[in-house]
């Protein structure tokens, strides 16, 4: 078992502005699917109001209608993908994205390819994307012809043997889907490091719960960066001009022993797949306090929602909402057991909802 595989896995585990900001918000459940799923990806709303998503544990790609409760399985899951396999086949569907022209991209984590589908659920072709900075898939797309990739290669390894690279910043690459041209559109702050120990091996690793920057893009190519150390959102217009947001004060939550135990248990569980002995000594670097947010998702209307960390794993989630001018607007508490999964038209907010037996389903909410 390679130490870097465990380190990488643990690192992963890890519109117009209102003139007056609202202090609180709430959600009303409008509809949810009657069936349950093992583990869900993000949710993408289609033009007719239906949704597309993947079950990342059962490895299936779905289209669903929240009004009727109807569920369609798209394409075919296979155990291996040939080089010339049709677009209808996938091995590990892990992420869904909306592209231009009424098309949807399905990112296959295992086959390391992205397939293009129409909104009727028909496969169109394999999307040719220039391979830059390693084999990690492109997850972010706009509707004007670009994909976006965060260049984590220097952090996760792959450089010269015996040489450790710890960059101060991590570039975000913009890749033209037609011509393959690549440029850098943003830079994220580099993460904080500490020593991780697996048995008798010691290696630098990213600190768990330390602040990280997140990148996203709106359909028209407007990009944003949520700054973890400053707790703010900066915006990049399509012409390259930047607007620096305003930092928002937050209450720092301490990293507890319970938090540490939970993360290390997840590392051990993941290590089983690589044959890691369960009695192996495992230590991991942790931050003293939790970052102001641990997830960020952009809304097509020009908002960015930042997911606050929780004092306890069972606590309900709350999101801080920033507008396109970089100002904090409001907080939105979610019902217990639900988490943000995507956005849609006419104010639709999609969430993963726990069903009580460890499974999840998809629900559509509206702001009260």
Predicted features and spans:
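Bacterial N-terminal signal peptides
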Residues: 7-15
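Eukaryotic scaffold repeat domains enriched in small/polar residues
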Residues: 18-368
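Bacterial N-terminal signal peptides that target proteins for export
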Residues: 1-7
């Amino acid at each position: 078992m390679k130490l870097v595989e465990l380190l990488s896995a643990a690192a992963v585990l890890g519109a117009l502005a209102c003139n007056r900001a609202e202090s609180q918000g709430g959600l009303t459940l409008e509809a949810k699917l009657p069936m349950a799923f093992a583990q869900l990806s993000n949710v993408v709303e289609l033009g007719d109001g239906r949704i597309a998503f993947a079950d990342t544990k059962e490895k299936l790609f779905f289209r669903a209608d929240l009004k009727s409760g109807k569920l369609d399985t798209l394409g075919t899951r296979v155990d291996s993908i040939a080089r010339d396999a049709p677009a209808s086949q996938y091995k590990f569907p892990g992420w869904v994205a909306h592209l231009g022209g009424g098309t949807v991209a399905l990112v296959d984590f295992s086959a390391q390819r992205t397939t293009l589908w129409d909104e009727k659920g028909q496969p169109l072709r394999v999307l040719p994307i220039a391979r830059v900075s390693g084999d990690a898939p492109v997850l972010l797309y706009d509707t004007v012809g670009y994909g976006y990739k965060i260049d984590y290669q220097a952090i996760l390894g792959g450089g010269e043997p015996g040489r450790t690279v710890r960059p101060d910043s991590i570039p975000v690459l913009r890749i033209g889907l037609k011509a393959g041209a690549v440029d850098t559109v943003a830079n994220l702050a580099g993460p904080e490091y500490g020593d991780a120990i697996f048995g008798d091996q010691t290696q630098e690793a990213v600190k768990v719960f330390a602040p990280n920057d997140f990148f996203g893009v709106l359909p028209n190519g407007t990009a944003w960066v949520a700054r973890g150390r400053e707790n703010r959102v900066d915006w990049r217009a399509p012409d390259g001009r930047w607007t620096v947001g305003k930092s928002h004060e937050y209450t720092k939550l301490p990293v507890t022993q319970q938090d540490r135990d939970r993360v290390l248990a997840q590392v051990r569980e993941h290590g089983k797949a690589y044959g890691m002995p369960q009695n192996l000594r495992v230590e991991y670097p942790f931050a003293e306090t939790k970052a102001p947010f641990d997830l960020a998702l952009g809304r097509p209307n020009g908002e960015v929602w930042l997911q606050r960390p929780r004092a306890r794993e069972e606590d309900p989630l709350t999101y801080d909402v920033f507008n396109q001018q970089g100002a904090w607007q409001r907080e939105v508490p979610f019902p217990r057991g639900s988490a943000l999964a995507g956005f849609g038209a006419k104010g639709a907010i999609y969430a993963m909802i726990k069903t009580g037996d460890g499974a999840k389903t998809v629900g559509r909410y509206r702001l009260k």
